Amino acid sequence: MSISPSELGPLFKQHFDGRRFVVVSNREPYEHRWSEEVGEMDVRRPAGGLTSALDPLMQALGGMWVAWGSGEADAAAVDPEGRTRVPPENPSYTLRRVWLTHHDIHRYYLGFSNQFMWPLCHLRPDLTRIRARYWERYRRVNRRFAEAVLEEVRGKEAAIWFQDYHLALAPLFVRARRPDLALAHFWHIPFPPMEIFRLSPQAGYLLRGMLANDLMGFHLPGFADNFLRCARRLAGAEVDFAARTATLDGHTCYVGDFPISIDLDQFRDAATAPGVE
């Protein structure tokens, strides 16, 4: 079954009863860069499946996207609160940028996320590199993302959708301050078997972060099953495999598999564009 962008807005409002919709990811959907003309900026869409898949959704629903401001001119394109409206040709939602330092990028992103989490989840623990400073910075940056989310939903009902392995702890920090919010998380890479994930010294803490969500999503049923087994054995959660739930400290997280889609019309247009054979 497919659904058009024009149908998404009414469907969301029907099921979420007017809650503000907030997407949270490491990668931003639009970057500002300085052009060759002095003082002028260009806007580009970074390559990547996550932003390509979610940008049409956000344009249909509106709301807020919280992400790392990675473009060289990003700071010059936002208001004092770090916000800008996107896309530039038809502003439909607000992008709230989170700023990362040089150490943040090298320890949270290139370090813990990409040198540890990525190979571990792809069944290559032999390629992992772990440093105490990587983990500490990962925690710190996840808390910074959580603080940005909390600022944007202060005094509001909201549905928050976290993305991927960069932000495994952020739901825990948000839940601690706002237990009333609806939290979901989609994991865009494989989730490994327990025998692999337990090799992480921080496995229990990472799982607690993910279990703070109301809904945890994966691409495949096997990834969801791996997560449930890890939740039971490594985090001490009470797991119901038939219902696909994991309960920890009185909070129940539902776990499912939701293969992500693509913008079919966009791919058809690209395939028939001049110069494509």
Which residues fall in each region the model found?
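Catalytic cores of carbohydrate-active enzymes across secretory and cytosolic contexts
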Residues: M1-E277
